[in-house]
Curated annotation (Swiss-Prot):
Keywords: Ribonucleoprotein, Ribosomal protein, RNA-binding, rRNA-binding
Protein family (similarity comment): Belongs to the universal ribosomal protein uS11 family.
Top-rank taxon, per record: Bacteria
The protein's assembly and partners: Part of the 30S ribosomal subunit. Interacts with proteins S7 and S18. Binds to IF-3.
GO biological process, one term: translation
Stated role: Located on the platform of the 30S subunit, it bridges several disparate RNA helices of the 16S rRNA. Forms part of the Shine-Dalgarno cleft in the 70S ribosome.
GO molecular function, one term: structural constituent of ribosome
Gene3D superfamilies linked: Ribosomal protein S11
PTM: May be methylated on an undetermined residue.
Encoding gene (name): rpsK
Higher taxonomy: Bacteria, Pseudomonadati, Pseudomonadota, Alphaproteobacteria, Hyphomicrobiales
Name of the protein: Small ribosomal subunit protein uS11
SUPFAM superfamilies recorded: Translational machinery components
Gene Ontology CC terms: ribonucleoprotein complex; ribosome
Matches recorded under InterPro entries: Ribosomal_uS11 (IPR001971), Ribosomal_uS11_bac-type (IPR019981), Ribosomal_uS11_sf (IPR036967)
């Protein structure tokens, strides 16, 4: 008989003072990942993991709640300063950035890293509402 196969693994507390916040805001969702300088993930959250479903995931408020959650997780690891990389066309870009600043982080730089095709793939058809 196999017993206690599910063992609770505690996340060890890393002492990292500065990191990079990657805010990816699509038309449907907003994901925020905080990494160290090498790109190793420290904490992450999204509008979907915060309990928003459907079209509510794409709202600025959902991005703000996700940013507050990931900020709390990152501050447990001792993080104080952030560089912010924003990508995507979504509506949660600015509100996520404002929520990170309001959580007490010192934002040293803000970069827009949205990829722009040099006439790559054919875009999807226009919506007719």
């Amino acid at each position: 008989m196999a017993k206690d196969a599910t063992r609770i693994r505690r996340r060890e507390r890393k002492n990292i003072a500065s990191g990079i916040a990657h805010v990816n805001s699509s038309f449907n969702n907003t994901t925020i990942t905080i990494t160290d300088a090498q790109g190793n993930a420290i904490a992450w959250s999204s509008a979907g993991t915060m309990g928003f479903k459907g079209s509510r995931k794409s709202t600025p408020y959902a991005a703000q709640v996700a940013a507050e959650d990931v900020a709390k997780k990152a501050q447990e690891h001792g993080m104080r300063t952030l560089e912010v990389e924003v990508a995507g066309p979504g509506s949660g870009r600015e509100s996520a950035l404002r929520a990170l600043q309001a959580a007490g982080f010192t934002v040293t730089s803000i970069r827009d890293v949205t990829t722009i095709p040099h006439n790559g793939c054919r875009p999807r058809k226009r919506r007719r509402v």
